[in-house]
Amino acid sequence: MAESNADVYASFGVNSAVMSGGSVEEHEQNMLALDVAARDGDDAIELASDEVETERDLYDNSDPFGQEDDEGRIQVRIGDGSEPTDVDTGEEGVEGTEGSEEFTPLGETPEELVAASEQLGEHEEGFQEMINIAAERGMSVETIEAIQREYEENEELSAESYAKLAEIGYTKAFIDSYIRGQEALVEQYVNSVIEYAGGRERFDALYNHLETHNPEAAQSLDNALTNRDLATVKAIINLAGESRAKAFGRKPTRSVTNRAIPAKPQATKREGFADRSEMIKAMSDPRYRTDANYRRQVEQKVIDSNF
């Protein structure tokens, strides 16, 4: 069966509404009502899908990583030079603290030190008695002094000295036993003094300070230790502690903007105690415990004393 014109138009998507009417205006209106794909000669305009990525605006100042996790990233801030930049090195600042600790004056002499001093004194009295007996048994004073000097210099006795002592009844075993006992008591006494002063490190620091800045006081301390004069030992150690605290315990106040003008040196007259009883009386004064200036004056007079 032959196709009609309407069937032919329908195969191209043209319905009867397009063909209806006899005027050109009516035909145009019917064509506009159809899908654009069905219009012969018209170009279809398609809009881009939202899924297509658009190019980022070159002037967009937003942070492209603003929504990302910062973990694992290193942030670097570049300064413009208008503000100082603090750099954290991970280390805390440490100021020099050499000698910055405050010195606490020594208090009452501990019983352990007093006991050690007394035991050493008793042993020395026994040694003097041995010397007297040696002299009574015929040993000359020159020989006794030579044996003493030999031990002080060499810290031991020669075979010749042992032989001379054996001649007057002092065997080698007896002499060695006596020497060991003497050394043990001396060590106990010295350790007690060091502990009283605050320990080995503190005692060495104070003694070295005296040797450097006041050699006379250092020698006075040696003499006081040898004579077991605990009052003088205490006074000199306190003086050394206060002197060292002044030298190292305070921050310097002079700077390039505060120039120090040296004062004219003035001679100071030093006068010590007349005797030991006068020194003990001054130390027994209540001000010695409560008044730092008074205590310092007393300690200085101890050093300047000649007894």
From Swiss-Prot:
The keyword Disulfide bond is annotated on this UniProt entry: no
InterPro entries documented for this protein: Gp9-like
One GO term of the biological process aspect: viral capsid assembly
Coiled-coil segments: none
Compositional bias of kind Acidic residues: 45-54, 83-101
Record's keyword terms, sorted: Viral capsid assembly, Viral release from host cell
Region (Disordered), start-end ranges: 45-105
Transmembrane segments: none
Keyword Transport set for record: no
Function statement: Scaffolding protein involved in the icosahedric procapsid assembly. Coassembles with the capsid proteins to form the procapsid, in which the scaffolding protein is found within the external shell of icosahedrally arranged capsid protein subunits. In a subsequent step the scaffolding protein molecules are released from the procapsid. Facilitates assembly by binding to gp10 hexamers but not the pentamers and locking them into a morphogenically correct conformation.
Family of this protein: Belongs to the T7likevirus capsid assembly scaffolding protein family.
Protein name, UniProt field: Capsid assembly scaffolding protein
Taxonomic source organism: Escherichia phage T7
